[in-house]
């Protein structure tokens, strides 16, 4: 398999074939919390992709010099440093969105997707493939976030990226916003529906009966 095909597979596989949320059921908590608006879902996607990609890269770069007994601590130190950079950038340039994301930017440090890829892939692979793997898993995470955020904001407030898409009753239109879509349980059900849809079209992802 060529290098280009390997890169394509590493980036696209986590989106549907091995999605970190839909298949591995990781990172669900933040997916419930930051998807009330498409813009927060999009920014969170960029943040997690940035942290996952670079943490993978740096962990892989020094993997042969990390004592096995402290590898988790080293990984968390690298991830935490990158999260602090992301948090400071958001506060400097996207302060309103930073306030909306609240503690969930800081909680990227404990995100199972980020920690999982650093431990399972970056510790055993070269830096560039690890970087690409991080990008792919960040995009897989973002695919679910953006899809859920799209439906929650559209049907919850009739808007996308804060701009009115469905004419609201309050403004003389026909659409009555569904407040239920702005509550966390709606995200839970939407993610469940996505998992069902993906496994319907990809039955090989269904767990075998014991």
UniProtKB/Swiss-Prot annotation:
<keyword id="KW-0406">Ion transport</keyword>
<feature type="transmembrane region" description="Helical">
    <location>
        <begin position="72"/>
        <end position="92"/>
    </location>
</feature>
<dbReference type="GO" id="GO:0005886">
    <property type="term" value="C:plasma membrane"/>
</dbReference>
<dbReference type="Pfam" id="PF02508">
    <property type="entry name" value="Rnf-Nqr"/>
</dbReference>
<feature type="transmembrane region" description="Helical">
    <location>
        <begin position="178"/>
        <end position="198"/>
    </location>
</feature>
<keyword id="KW-0830">Ubiquinone</keyword>
<comment type="similarity">
    <text>Belongs to the NqrDE/RnfAE family.</text>
</comment>
<keyword id="KW-1278">Translocase</keyword>
<comment type="subunit">
    <text>Composed of six subunits; NqrA, NqrB, NqrC, NqrD, NqrE and NqrF.</text>
</comment>
<feature type="transmembrane region" description="Helical">
    <location>
        <begin position="131"/>
        <end position="151"/>
    </location>
</feature>
<protein>
    <recommendedName>
        <fullName>Na(+)-translocating NADH-quinone reductase subunit D</fullName>
        <ecNumber>7.2.1.1</ecNumber>
    </recommendedName>
</protein>
<keyword id="KW-0813">Transport</keyword>
<feature type="transmembrane region" description="Helical">
    <location>
        <begin position="42"/>
        <end position="62"/>
    </location>
</feature>
<keyword id="KW-0520">NAD</keyword>
<dbReference type="InterPro" id="IPR011292">
    <property type="entry name" value="NqrD"/>
</dbReference>
<comment type="function">
    <text>NQR complex catalyzes the reduction of ubiquinone-1 to ubiquinol by two successive reactions, coupled with the transport of Na(+) ions from the cytoplasm to the periplasm. NqrA to NqrE are probably involved in the second step, the conversion of ubisemiquinone to ubiquinol.</text>
</comment>
<keyword id="KW-1003">Cell membrane</keyword>
<keyword id="KW-0472">Membrane</keyword>
<dbReference type="GO" id="GO:0006814">
    <property type="term" value="P:sodium ion transport"/>
</dbReference>
<keyword id="KW-0812">Transmembrane</keyword>
<keyword id="KW-0915">Sodium</keyword>
<dbReference type="GO" id="GO:0016655">
    <property type="term" value="F:oxidoreductase activity, acting on NAD(P)H, quinone or similar compound as acceptor"/>
</dbReference>
<keyword id="KW-0739">Sodium transport</keyword>
<keyword id="KW-1133">Transmembrane helix</keyword>
<keyword id="KW-0997">Cell inner membrane</keyword>
<dbReference type="InterPro" id="IPR003667">
    <property type="entry name" value="NqrDE/RnfAE"/>
</dbReference>
<feature type="transmembrane region" description="Helical">
    <location>
        <begin position="103"/>
        <end position="123"/>
    </location>
</feature>
């Amino acid at each position: 398999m060529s290098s280009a095909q390997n890169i394509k597979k590493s980036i696209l596989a986590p989106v549907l074939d091995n999605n970190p949320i839909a298949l591995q059921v990781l990172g669900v908590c933040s997916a419930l919390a930051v998807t009330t608006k498409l813009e927060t879902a999009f920014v969170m996607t960029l943040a997690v992709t940035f942290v996952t990609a670079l943490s993978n890269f740096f962990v892989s770069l020094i993997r042969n010099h990390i004592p096995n007994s402290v590898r988790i601590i080293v990984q968390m130190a690298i991830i935490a440093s990158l999260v602090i950079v992301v948090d400071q950038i958001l506060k400097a340039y996207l302060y309103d969105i930073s306030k909306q994301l609240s503690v969930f930017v800081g909680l990227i440090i404990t995100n199972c997707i980020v920690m999982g890829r650093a431990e399972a892939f970056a510790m055993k692979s070269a830096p560039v493939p690890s970087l690409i793997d991080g990008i792919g898993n960040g995009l897989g995470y973002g695919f679910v976030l953006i899809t859920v955020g799209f439906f929650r904001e559209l049907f919850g407030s009739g808007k996308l990226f804060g701009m009115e898409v469905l004419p609201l009753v309050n403004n003389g239109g026909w659409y009555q916003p569904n407040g239920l879509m702005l509550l966390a349980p709606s995200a839970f059900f939407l993610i469940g529906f996505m998992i069902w849809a993906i496994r319907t079209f990809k039955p090989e992802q269904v767990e075998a009966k014991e």
